[in-house]
Amino acid sequence: MITATALGKSLAQYIAPIADQFNQLGIPEPIVHWGHPFFMSIVILAMGSYAGISGWKVRLQKDDASRSAHKRVSLWMTTFLAMGYTGGLLSLVMQGQPLLESPHFWTGTAVLLLLAVNGSLSLFGFGNANVALAGKFRTAHAYLGTAILSLLVFHALLGVRLGLSI
């Protein structure tokens, strides 16, 4: 059976050549250590809160401007979170830390998977010819999105704990 530790070591070996390229740039250690949390906090706080607020405005007030903003910001937020996920793995490899072992890794993975599910709800469910079913998809999307934002806050706290421990 493959363990998380063995899989993490295998993944680290795959990422190591990329990390070596970045290490050759002479990036200061504080940037390598705290760059990922700094930029991800901007994405989570600015884009996450805006996506959540605009999403609930659409739900409660049927605001077309908020609908457009929610779609646009949510898509970019998800893109930046996916890029940050890979950047976080790269940062850990650059610092010689193990992969796939921290709760921060697992909550980040869960966030991306849940964002994919939530995006699928809107993509495949909102245009459903059955209006009642489309409404249920919208309700599930709203509450799942709120749960994802809550998970992101918990994820950030785990990240601070991880950052302070290494």
Describe the predicted segments one by one.
Residues 1-166:
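Membrane-embedded alpha-helical bundles that constitute the cytochrome b-like, heme-associated redox core
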